[in-house]
Amino acid sequence: MDANASRVDPKLLELLVCPLTKGRLRYDAEAHELVSEKARLAYPIRDGVPIMLVSEARKIED
């Protein structure tokens, strides 16, 4: 995967929130995901586009 394709614009990251909790998201560059600590969900980034659907999110395990 091209490293540039998985980057998230910092300005976009400031605007995006978890659709479930409306809380802030943390960008995990290694996993190419946006993480909602509150909801314990990780939203994938595909071709540089954050997929902000709860049904597409990965549940974060302890």
Swiss-Prot record:
Pfam families: Trm112p (PF03966). SUPFAM superfamilies: Trm112p-like (SSF158997). Disulfide bonds: none annotated. InterPro entries: Trm112-like. Gene3D superfamilies: 2.20.25.10. It comes from the Bacteria. One of its GO terms (cellular component) is cytosol. Belongs to the UPF0434 family. This is UPF0434 protein NGR_c31900. It comes from Sinorhizobium fredii (strain NBRC 101917 / NGR234).
